[in-house]
């Protein structure tokens, strides 16, 4: 056992540990809780989208569809998990895909609004349809990729984190380097954020397998990025006072995010990895008389 780094633990002592879920290739309770929460939010958003399409004018016309679809979305998740339990990492993969799709939809929508004349802008029905479509497609893609290719909660969350931070840093640095008096400044910044979002997603998918972080490590990385941005940006504004330059502030904030992410990466480098359990087949046993 020492050679194989194996230990014996009573099942009762595992509690909410992911060990049992990983061994059985079943989603953890934490994953499912996050998926239920996001499915309700998706249902509420779908209700809002429908109210825009139908041009609902009463409070009931707006609220009731959202409530029904919010509860219905959670019911669909429960039905799927009851019929065919989600595999380990799949719920988080769905959530990551949903968030990526939402971010894509928002950025593309506002980029389009920024690049065209006011009379060519999309109507609310088109805007909400694009955002809803990207969100739904992202959730579906995340579920398919997670189920077919196999993943872990940490890997799936890592992809969402790399894409978000890449978009944020790219957008802020572009803001700092762009002449904000230029009429095309806003669409340039939004397009840069879109490129950063997709580059981060691709980079995250390529690196997730080798990094294979636990979801706890991903949260620490996010904390590092948030803390670094607040620290650097806050200190700059505090030091400059009334003479604060907006472009310098966003550049320093972006630098702080990168520094915070890098620091968190180094500090968490010793955390254990979250590898999938590879199923093995038992070796054949033969018996011979002696």
Q: Which residues are covered by each model-predicted region?
A:
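Short, highly charged
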Residues: 44, 48-56
